[in-house]
């Protein structure tokens, strides 16, 4: 299903097996999303919000993970508030995906009028100075759209990704990501291809919030709890001679607009130790996500790795027991 260019770049390829009847359901889903993407957002967003909330009630394991994460990160919020955040998260997810599909099908000129950049001058200055850049991007639902927009404007982009479980969805999703150019690097291939791309002038896209286990990670504060955070961005900025720029997209289903927030480069990381780097990474996530928690992918096992002697929260039977 895939080929490699220069032993580093992942290029999705159509496989003849995708025509098999076992994948027809997946193709129907792809066709449905394409049709929805061509529908004006003022009509599709309310429908997608209702469908998303409904799916969020059915997906009990995903909902449980999200509620556990929120209970540890925001213990000061009431149960009703956390439930509302999860509902809005599930509403936001299909809305953001539909905008991504619309961008791929109709092109950037159709969605640019609904995109607001905050801090665009930071990006423009680095482009003028021909600087190497790695964007630090918390895992939000609209995470791919800013990279696609920058690629559509001629900026070479490179990102790492995990394969989807369904090969048809994996093929379509990554084809959409590469719609306007750029490079994709499979995480299974390691970090070196990504480093090579950034050194060659591609702007990197790095998601800082996944749990990579205890090895090489630092236990640092994350909202009201703590998280095993890999301080790799500090090494990457040195090896690539790149500046690290925090970025976060926010999709508003009521206004049908995407706001892309860009914060000043994290130049303070150059001389920082691993613990400080890890904490600064989490601080940027908190700054972006705190005001708009529904934008974040709380369904991930963000807090899987715990300190010795502490039970993984998702295995605790006292936290949101399944019925």
Q: What positions do the PLM features span?
A:
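General small-molecule cofactor/ligand-binding pocket signal
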Residues: 116, 185, 263
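Catalytic core of membrane glycerolipid acyltransferases/transacylases, capturing the structured
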Residues: 129-188, 214-221, 225, 255
């Amino acid at each position: 299903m895939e080929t490699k260019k220069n032993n580093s770049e992942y290029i999705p390829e159509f496989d003849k097996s995708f025509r098999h009847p076992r994948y027809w359901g997946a193709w129907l889903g792809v066709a449905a999303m394409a049709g929805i993407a061509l529908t004006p957002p003022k009509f599709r967003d309310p429908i997608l919000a209702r469908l998303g909330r409904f799916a969020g009630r059915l997906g009990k394991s995903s909902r449980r993970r999200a509620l556990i994460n929120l209970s540890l990160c925001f213990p000061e919020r009431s149960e009703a508030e956390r439930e509302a955040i999860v509902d809005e998260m599930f509403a936001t997810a299909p809305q953001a995906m539909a905008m991504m599909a619309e961008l791929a099908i109709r092109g950037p000129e159709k969605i640019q009028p609904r995109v607001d950049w905050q801090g665009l001058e930071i990006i423009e200055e680095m482009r003028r100075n021909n600087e190497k850049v790695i964007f630090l991007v918390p895992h939000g639902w609209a995470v791919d759209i800013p990279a696609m927009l920058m690629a559509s404007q001629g900026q070479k982009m490179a990102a790492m990704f995990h394969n989807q479980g369904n090969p048809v969805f994996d093929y379509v999703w990554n084809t959409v990501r590469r719609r306007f150019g750029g490079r994709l690097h499979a995480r299974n291939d390691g970090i070196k291809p990504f480093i090579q791309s950034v050194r060659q002038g591609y702007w990197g896209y790095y998601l800082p919030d996944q749990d990579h286990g205890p090895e090489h990670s630092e236990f640092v504060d994350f909202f009201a709890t703590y998280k095993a955070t890999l301080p790799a961005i500090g090494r990457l900025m040195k090896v690539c001679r790149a500046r690290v720029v925090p970025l976060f997209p926010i999709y508003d289903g009521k206004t049908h607009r995407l706001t892309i927030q860009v914060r000043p480069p994290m130049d303070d990381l150059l001389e920082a130790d691993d613990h400080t780097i890890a904490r600064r990474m989490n601080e940027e996530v908190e700054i972006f996500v705190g005001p708009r928690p529904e934008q974040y992918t709380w369904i991930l096992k963000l807090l899987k790795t715990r300190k010795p002697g502490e039970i993984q929260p998702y295995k605790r039977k006292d936290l949101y027991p399944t019925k």
